[in-house]
Amino acid sequence: MDIKLGKYKPVKEEYIKSFKDMLLLRRFEEKCGQLYGMGEIGGFCHLYIGQEAVISAVDMVKQKEDSMVTSYRDHAHIILAGTEPKYVLAELMGRATGCSKGKGGSMHLFDVPNKFYGGHGIVGAQVPIGTGLAFAEKYNGTNNICFTFLGDGAVNQGQVYEAFNMAALWGLPVVYIIENNEYSMGTSVARSTFMRDLYKKGESFGIKGFQLNGMDFEEMYDGVKQAAEYVRENSMPLILEVKTYRYRGHSMSDPAKYRSKEEVETYKERDPITEIRKIILENNYASEADLKEIEQSVKEIVKEAVEFSENSPLPNEEELYTQIYV
């Protein structure tokens, strides 16, 4: 099986939904950055600004019963999995109404009813978990698959390759999506990885891999749809490396001095939201007024999330003793 781009193209409604989804994620993350600067969000906080086309395309392709697991850069993933933004922001602000009851924070977001299994703070630790979720689907005889996200920094972790081996050996229905934003904290892929074509990392296990432009919603939609079909039909793992870019630092405490302003601006010129907006207008899928209305509705969602979170209580002391399993 080879992914030959051009097989699938989004329809009008999917373009419009993706525009709204990506814009919501952008505005939500911008607000998180603002609240962090004001001291309303504590701890670590990793923003997804610039990478929105990746999760938006996966959300379009993913079926309701498919599961997802990702790293600590997880705000966008849980929102598109179906969690209301207000419960995500409440979690970031440490409120009892948060999706993890105010105890997980930015890096440990969970929504099991929506098949979202985290948010994991240890680099690469989610990969064995995603592999296990795929094992459960196969064991239970479902036709569901697991989308397991990891960053370019995680590809050098030993547990990732143990998981790859098990997935190939047992024929597990998992799509490994490597979100290659070029920097593992402040270390570039070129400085940390000999094999820089990360989609080839599974070759020694017989796992097929492909590379996609993660800044291009149309290419992501096409490639992810074909990948999901392959995994679902063959019950075999597959690796997708998506070349993307984060506009902000690794986390809120990272000034990102290891890259130039010119480099960042080069990627911003390919901004996925700007591009999909252009496609929508050029094809008359929606008018300028329609898009302005979407933009206003997104502002209202973010505003509601802030008001809800600010007015939510902090967790009770009793919560220190709940959900403890070890």
UniProtKB/Swiss-Prot annotation:
Q: What is its EC number?
A: 1.2.4.1
Query: What's an example GO BP annotation here?
Result: pyruvate decarboxylation to acetyl-CoA
Q: Which cofactor does it need?
A: thiamine diphosphate
Q: What class of enzyme is it?
A: oxidoreductase
Q: Which UniProt keywords apply?
A: Oxidoreductase, Pyruvate, Thiamine pyrophosphate
Q: Which InterPro entries match?
A: DH_E1 (IPR001017), PDH_E1_Alpha_Subunit (IPR050642), Pyrv_DH_E1_asu_subgrp-y (IPR017597), THDP-binding (IPR029061)
GO MF entry, a single one: pyruvate dehydrogenase (acetyl-transferring) activity
Catalysed conversion reaction: N(6)-[(R)-lipoyl]-L-lysyl-[protein] + pyruvate + H(+) = N(6)-[(R)-S(8)-acetyldihydrolipoyl]-L-lysyl-[protein] + CO2
**Is the keyword Oxidoreductase assigned to this protein?**
yes
Q: Which GO terms describe its cellular component?
A: intracellular membrane-bounded organelle
Could you tell me what this protein does? The pyruvate dehydrogenase complex catalyzes the overall conversion of pyruvate to acetyl-CoA and CO(2). It contains multiple copies of three enzymatic components: pyruvate dehydrogenase (E1), dihydrolipoamide acetyltransferase (E2) and lipoamide dehydrogenase (E3).
Family annotation (PANTHER family): PYRUVATE DEHYDROGENASE E1 COMPONENT SUBUNIT ALPHA (PTHR11516:SF60), PYRUVATE DEHYDROGENASE E1 COMPONENT, ALPHA SUBUNIT BACTERIAL AND ORGANELLAR (PTHR11516)
User: How does this protein assemble?
Assistant: Heterodimer of an alpha and a beta chain.
The protein, known as = Pyruvate dehydrogenase E1 component subunit alpha
Q: Which organism is it from?
A: Rickettsia bellii (strain RML369-C)
